[in-house]
């Protein structure tokens, strides 16, 4: 797997969960002898929703809600076979979305 690169993108709503998952991935990759670049924090996406509280009148009565999507990027340079095998066996938290691309 020479001259390869594995790019891992993580997304989660909870920043503690995504930091824990990135730490597990980085520790696993370093333990198997691969070079790791990152974790690189990407911009947090904030979605805001405004909802009217009253059913009929009082347009001034509103609630605002926010969902934050935290993102991290990890590059694994020159991964070995052991690295790929260990990453495939890694059990991450349920609230973390993982996208892996080879390049």
Curated annotation (Swiss-Prot):
InterPro entries given in the database record: Ribosomal_uS10, Ribosomal_uS10_CS, Ribosomal_uS10_dom, Ribosomal_uS10_dom_sf
Any one cellular-component term (Gene Ontology): ribonucleoprotein complex
GO molecular function: structural constituent of ribosome; tRNA binding
Swiss-Prot/TrEMBL keywords: Ribonucleoprotein, Ribosomal protein
SUPFAM superfamilies with a match to the protein in the record: Ribosomal protein S10
GO biological process: translation
Signal peptide: none
Assembly, per entry: Part of the 30S ribosomal subunit.
Family according to the record: Belongs to the universal ribosomal protein uS10 family.
Function: Involved in the binding of tRNA to the ribosomes.
Protein name: Small ribosomal subunit protein uS10
